[in-house]
Amino acid sequence: MFSGFHIQRKKECEKQMERVIEDTQIGHLLDMHPYDLSGGEQQRAALAKVLLLEPEILLLDEPTKGLDGFYKQKLADIFERLKKRGVTILMVSHDIEFCASYGDTCAMFFDGSVITSQSAKAFFVGNSFYTTAANRMARQLYPDAVTVKEVIEACSKNRRQE
């Protein structure tokens, strides 16, 4: 009976490992030495290692650093699934576009203190300096558009109204 428990647990662990490998798309990296991985591949491998622990809270420092646009979308999908499972994700990032597109709440630290904390939308709309390129370019016409997607939607809506 005791060995049956271990066999079942081993199968569960293997299944979880396969799921994490697939989610983080690191299957082709498993036989490589960590020093041979690119920065983005190292980020994905590190995320996979952490996800195997099934954390309730994820503390991430610059998780998009070194990632291409395709994998940033994949990372956002992973974060969304984790949030649905009740995982809290706290990340520090200078990737304004990623934070604007996928963040729930954004805060700014200055001199060791949080000086503001708002919904991602309110944070980037109300900020002249720390905002997205899309918001800077379109704010005169569409002040509430923060992401490229929102600017495109606002343009399309405006065009239909003409």
Predicted segments with their positions:
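Conserved beta-strand-loop-alpha-helix hinge in the C-terminal portion
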Residues: 113-137
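ABC ATPase nucleotide-binding domains
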Residues: 130-162
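H-loop/switch region of ABC-family ATPase nucleotide-binding domains
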Residues: 93-94
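Conserved ABC ATPase signature
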Residues: 33-37, 41
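Catalytic Walker B motif of ABC-type/P-loop ATPase nucleotide-binding domains
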Residues: 58-61
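Conserved ABC ATPase "signature" region
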Residues: 12-29
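Hydrophobic anchor residue at the start of the ABC signature
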Residues: 47
